[in-house]
Amino acid sequence: MKLLEDRIHSDGQVLGQDILKVDRFLTHQVDYQLMKEIGKRFAQVYADAEVTKVVTIEASGIAPALYAAESLNVPMIFAKKAKNVTMNDDLLITEVYSFTKKLTSTVQISSKLIEEGDKVLIIDDFLANGQAALGLVHLMEQAKAEVVGLGMVIEKSFQDGRQKLLDQGMKLTSIARIEKFEDGKVIFAPADDIAFD
């Protein structure tokens, strides 16, 4: 999506060899208009997939997932990283490693929210090593739900997450794909949604 690539160029900041800071529009401050366009794009790509639920992981995946769910007219559920006192029923639980935070979190979703046979679209903010996405896929497998696709706002294609998901037979759509960082600049690979631009 050219709109997202332009925003990454103008407001993204490359940190070191493998980190992109996008806190001006996605990971801290949220540009709701951009997120709405991204959500609409995911809905276009998966319009024929009969999605019944959109699932993400807190926190930065929530905005694009919510707008995708709105466009698809289905509920959005986010996996929580911390259990609270109201989550006292059966839980779907898995471990997820965060590349950026360098820590492993236990994530959970109430089993009452995902039904056997649900057709789930998983949305997340970044795809790096694929651990968050694979963790969400594992939660959906526990619920006997079908993952019909994965939508990533930004993919770091120079890391192995994409290949891990494709090796699992997943349909993957990344709105912006980063081929590499060069001299502090982002070099893009062709995005998966290019037919919609």
Swiss-Prot record:
Pathway: Purine metabolism; XMP biosynthesis via salvage pathway; XMP from xanthine: step 1/1
InterPro entries in the record: PRibTrfase_dom, PRTase-like, Pur/Pyrimidine_PRTase, Xanthine_PRibTrfase
GO biological process: purine ribonucleoside salvage; xanthine metabolic process; XMP salvage
UniProt binding sites for xanthine: L20, T27, K156
Organism for this UniProt entry: Lactococcus lactis subsp. cremoris (strain SK11)
Reactions catalysed: XMP + diphosphate = xanthine + 5-phospho-alpha-D-ribose 1-diphosphate
Family: Belongs to the purine/pyrimidine phosphoribosyltransferase family. Xpt subfamily.
Any one GO MF annotation of this record: xanthine phosphoribosyltransferase activity
UniProt cross-references to SUPFAM superfamilies, sorted A to Z: PRTase-like (SSF53271)
Entry protein name: Xanthine phosphoribosyltransferase
Record key words, sorted: Cytoplasm, Glycosyltransferase, Purine salvage, Transferase
Annotated 5-phospho-alpha-D-ribose 1-diphosphate binding sites: A128, N129, G130, Q131, A132
One GO cellular component term noted in the UniProt record for this chain: cytoplasm
The encoding gene: xpt
Highest taxon in the source lineage: Bacteria
UniProt subcellular location: Cytoplasm
Function: Converts the preformed base xanthine, a product of nucleic acid breakdown, to xanthosine 5'-monophosphate (XMP), so it can be reused for RNA or DNA synthesis.
Assigned EC number: 2.4.2.22
NCBIfam families noted in UniProt: PRK09219.1, XPRTase
Known partners and oligomeric status: Homodimer.
Pfam family, one: Pribosyltran
